[in-house]
Amino acid sequence: MAINVIINGINGKMGRVVKENITAQSDLELVSGTGRQDDLAKTIQTTHADVVIDFTTPQSVFHNAEIIIQSGARPVIGTTGLTLEQIALLDKQCRNKKLGAIVAPNFSVGAVLMMKYAKEAAHYFPDVEIIEMHHSQKIDAPSGTAIKTAQMIGEMRSSKKDEPFKDRARGEIKNGIPIHSIRLPGLFSHQSVIFGSNGETLTIRHDGMDRNCTMPGIFMACRKVMELDYLVYGLENLL
């Protein structure tokens, strides 16, 4: 039986690409798409949606996720902006409803592997900085992927305070790790995690050329979320 899917934010750039690609997935049925003016809860109920893919805005994503869960569907969220406290609240709601949810800063399998390998490298290299580069239309900075990478590396290190540099050109500190953000036309999605030690450096880099690089991860999440009864944060926890 096919999984009934709604795309919330279907008129956005990511929503349109998901719509174009989902028709090739025989086990995923696109039953509706919603935007700002639509009643999301009513749409979930009338279409009997199993999964709602959310690519909306940082300002609305938490409210959207609560609506999805309370309406009995499973959120697959690629929108950035959720805090760890909000993710914990959503997880509690999922467990109460016995519904799965997936929140992923990046659905690209290559980007997720970059984060995973960076976490492993942090065992051996205590000094690290992150450079993330995106197209000029990207709203948030640092990117959700860079913040998640810093969190994962931070798990492997003794805690460091996020004290800002006196020189702001040195970047923003997350989990004790400097992050440098670049926004330019001609770029899409690129991140380098650069480790340094005596006499050597190690760079782990991922380059996403267009939004299609996230499609396998998104569709995998739509299938995996049906097996869960709690929230999973990060696609790396599904690989």
From Swiss-Prot:
It is an enzyme of class 1 (oxidoreductase). Keywords: Amino-acid biosynthesis, Cytoplasm, Diaminopimelate biosynthesis, Lysine biosynthesis, NAD, NADP, Oxidoreductase. Pathway: Amino-acid biosynthesis; L-lysine biosynthesis via DAP pathway; (S)-tetrahydrodipicolinate from L-aspartate: step 4/4. (S)-2,3,4,5-tetrahydrodipicolinate binds at residues 135, 144-145. Its main location: cytoplasm. Disulfide bonds: none annotated. GO terms for cellular component: cytosol. NAD(+) binds at residues 9-14, 78-80, 104-107. It catalyses: (S)-2,3,4,5-tetrahydrodipicolinate + NAD(+) + H2O = (2S,4S)-4-hydroxy-2,3,4,5-tetrahydrodipicolinate + NADH + H(+); (S)-2,3,4,5-tetrahydrodipicolinate + NADP(+) + H2O = (2S,4S)-4-hydroxy-2,3,4,5-tetrahydrodipicolinate + NADPH + H(+). GO terms for molecular function: 4-hydroxy-tetrahydrodipicolinate reductase; NAD binding; NADP binding; oxidoreductase activity, acting on CH or CH2 groups, NAD or NADP as acceptor. Its EC number is 1.17.1.8. GO terms for biological process: diaminopimelate biosynthetic process; lysine biosynthetic process via diaminopimelate. Signal peptide: none annotated. It is found in: Cytoplasm. Transmembrane segments: none annotated. The active site is at residues 134, 138. Catalyzes the conversion of 4-hydroxy-tetrahydrodipicolinate (HTPA) to tetrahydrodipicolinate. NCBIfam families: dapB (TIGR00036). Belongs to the DapB family. This is 4-hydroxy-tetrahydrodipicolinate reductase. The lineage of its organism: Bacteria, Pseudomonadati, Pseudomonadota, Gammaproteobacteria, Legionellales.
